[in-house]
Amino acid sequence: MKTLRKALLATTCAVVALSATTYVSAQRGQRPLSNVEPVRHLVYIATPGDNGTDNQSGVVVLDADKDYSFLKRISYELPASKMPGPKVSGITVSLPLQMLYVTTDGWMKAIDLATDKVVWTFNGESAPVERTRGAASGCCERPWTLPDGKTLLVGSSYNSWWYYIDGATGKSLFKLPTPEANVAHNLAVTADGKLAITGSMSSPKNGKAGVAVLDVPNRTVLRYMTFSEMVRPLTINHDGSLVYVNVNDLVGFEIGDVKTGKMLKRFEAPGDWKGKGYSHGIGMTPDESEIWVADPVNDLWHVWDNPGDGRNPVYNASKTIKPSAGVEHSWIDMTNDGKLALLGDSVVIDVKTHKEIAVLKDEFGRRIVHTEKALFLNFQDGKLIEANNQFAVGDAKAYAARMGTKTSEQQ
């Protein structure tokens, strides 16, 4: 009998406690814990790709929790006469502003994630074109959201400066000239927002640098870096001390020391590729244990193990990835937890096994040919709570965990 009374008492207390918790949550304007929605994992893909060859327009949204099934296509609100729109050049988001930003060869648009409506359009400004396909408007190449979540660093359209853009209004706050790296294209920014490593499609054959290192807060150029050929995609390690770049005429990559501005080493992939093409895709796992490099000549991705401080990668043939879609529109970004990689040819890879797990398709079941400009976005209760970035860069916490050390924040 005593046992029964104890059980009844315990049950009563539990019910009272749960009721109290629910009441307090309601008074604070919070949902009861039992009603909190699970996190949703979505993929946002900005289209069209190069020259509109994928017959796509707008931002395609897929549900990663349901085998990447189609959810929605967000319109750029263009008239039919301007469809499908210019080639997309970049994508980023702001958590504080709950905004999605898409850049193209001609304009940049901000989209409210709560309504999926265009909030503003930045059209750049008239400028001499430095390179074929550059937009006469001067807008825009890759964007990056700075740590304040409200300011964007955005490349001019294959031109000689970088914009600082107000994420709320689309107003140009500042233009930082980079005359020695005068064909703005790619960039990566350190987590603390102090350094930007910006890639330029300018050639050392013409006496120009391939990378400009920017002091972001002070809006100045610290130094330029030159590699063996024109720089293509790039990535950086956790603190921005090393930059890894693809260059013309190389299936592989080169490493540069950001502090000294010097190129350190060159790594060539095995196989028959010389004179046939070059890598256009490079990234690393968040813990920096692996470097992935595209090989469009042989339709595969090479993987280098990356021990120690990241200056001496070791090629690992056993990890080679052969996507079913091939390797043409090469790019790579990874989820923040390092579990998934999204390749630029519509394929999702399980990072641990190096195996393909999905091919991304639109509402008509067509493979989305160009997925270079895509993000993994996590939502809860309709709010964006986490985002990765366009470039598979190193992460300080993941790197420290692998190395058994502490980050500067943890020390």
Regions found by a protein language model. Name each.
Residues 22-26:
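Sec/Tat signal peptide C-region and signal peptidase I cleavage site
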Residues 1-11:
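Bacterial N-terminal signal peptides that target proteins for export
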Residues 27-411:
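Predominantly soluble domains enriched in secretory-pathway, periplasmic, or organellar proteins
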